[in-house]
Amino acid sequence: MDKLIIRGGRPLNGDVRISGAKNAVLPILASTLLADSPMTIGNVPHLQDVTTTMELLGRMGASLTVDERMHIEVDPTTTHDFVAPYELVKTMRASILVLGPMLARFGQAEVSMPGGCAIGSRPVNLHVDGLAAMGADISIDSGYIRARADRLKGARIVMDIVSVTGTENLMMAAALARGTTVIENAAREPEVVDLANCINTMGGQISGAGTDTIVIDGVETLHGCHYDVLPDRIETGTFLVAGAITGGKVRLRNTAPATLDAVLAKLEEAGAQMNIGEDWIELDMVGRRPRSVGLRTAPYPAFPTDMQAQFMALNSVAEGTAAIVETVFENRFMHALELQRMGADIRVEGNTALVRGVPKLTGAPVMATDLRASASLILAGLVAEGETLVDRIYHIDRGYECIEEKLSQLGASIRRVPG
């Protein structure tokens, strides 16, 4: 099992290109099942979750090719097996995203109950109840969600809680349904908007994405197209924190600043100087120690839960004390224990972590517990005195493309070693 070895204490400096968004490319790959002809997806990040999704589509019979630029062509017309098996789904919760499009396009689907990051309950009932409201015959049996429908019918669906994958699954299913579907209390994330834009490019009729009410007028068929995935706002935020925590100056290219308002506001509150263009962000923290920032995670457009761990690392070496409140997922403070091993002063009570900044962290062996937790440990390692060894980095490969190469490009001392 690979590990990362980091020698801290080097301010980062330089520019780096941001990859396509993991949380956008996975539903967009699932949406290719809706098309009646081949699709090409561009700006695809080279990630383990992308590989898993491609393997899942291939297992179902779709034909896939990848070129040297990581453009993925998917021909869904050869799909013949409508099962998403446990051995693939258990590694990635996003596998449930094939349920809606598979049912809408082929009238049947069997998807194993999902796995992925160990960060709490993410119930599938929102997906199941929404599809049932659209006329699907659904059962959960032997760990599988089994669904059938001749053709789904438009429905008014009110989501009990805001769910990104729930919104995406129902939006894809509704794209080929008969009539109009209205999703209320819908997720507003930029990745939901990107999926809607992709489906509309395929000939769909979706309006309201980015608001809490999405209207989908079902169409008879959707065609293949070329679509470029939007830049990854979480990778962007992570590299901005890397610049801030090390007292560096970084410029990020091929990003989407408009998707990052809450994160950029917190970085400015921490004392970072920011320059922002249409598709680039420059952060300057040279010669300054960050100030502690309190934050509360919530669905978009509020502060993203996927940036909570990175800001905990930043607060660990900041001036002052601040509270971090996690409202989206339970059990998402596992990185706090590992940061404490490096000397961080963190007290966790329920869904709140109180972080008192210390002058320095010390390198130590630490273990990644989930995707964003692993990013926080790398960030802590970049600023710690001495050597930090991060174990179980397969988590990081699920969501960050070539992270050690990009950080090295900015001047970090970081290398991957085999386990």
Curated annotation (Swiss-Prot):
CDD domains: UdpNAET
Binding site for UDP-N-acetyl-alpha-D-glucosamine: 93, 306, 328
Domain of life where this protein originates: Bacteria
Catalysed conversion reaction: phosphoenolpyruvate + UDP-N-acetyl-alpha-D-glucosamine = UDP-N-acetyl-3-O-(1-carboxyvinyl)-alpha-D-glucosamine + phosphate
Entries under Gene3D superfamilies matching the protein: Enolpyruvate transferase domain (3.65.10.10)
Keywords (A to Z) from UniProt: Cell cycle, Cell division, Cell shape, Cell wall biogenesis/degradation, Cytoplasm, Peptidoglycan synthesis, Pyruvate, Transferase
Listed pathway(s): Cell wall biogenesis; peptidoglycan biosynthesis
Binding site for phosphoenolpyruvate: 22-23
Chain positions found as 2-(S-cysteinyl)pyruvic acid O-phosphothioketal: 117
A GO CC term assigned to this protein in UniProt: cytoplasm
Source lineage: Bacteria, Pseudomonadati, Pseudomonadota, Gammaproteobacteria, Chromatiales
Annotated protein name in UniProt: UDP-N-acetylglucosamine 1-carboxyvinyltransferase
Record NCBIfam families: murA (TIGR01072), PRK09369.1 (NF006873)
Family of this protein: Belongs to the EPSP synthase family. MurA subfamily.
Function: Cell wall formation. Adds enolpyruvyl to UDP-N-acetylglucosamine.
InterPro entries according to UniProt: Enolpyruvate_Tfrase_dom, Enolpyruvate_Tfrase_sf, MurA_subfamily, RNA3'P_cycl/enolpyr_Trfase_a/b, UDP_GlcNAc_COvinyl_MurA
UniProt KW Aminoacyl-tRNA synthetase keyword: no
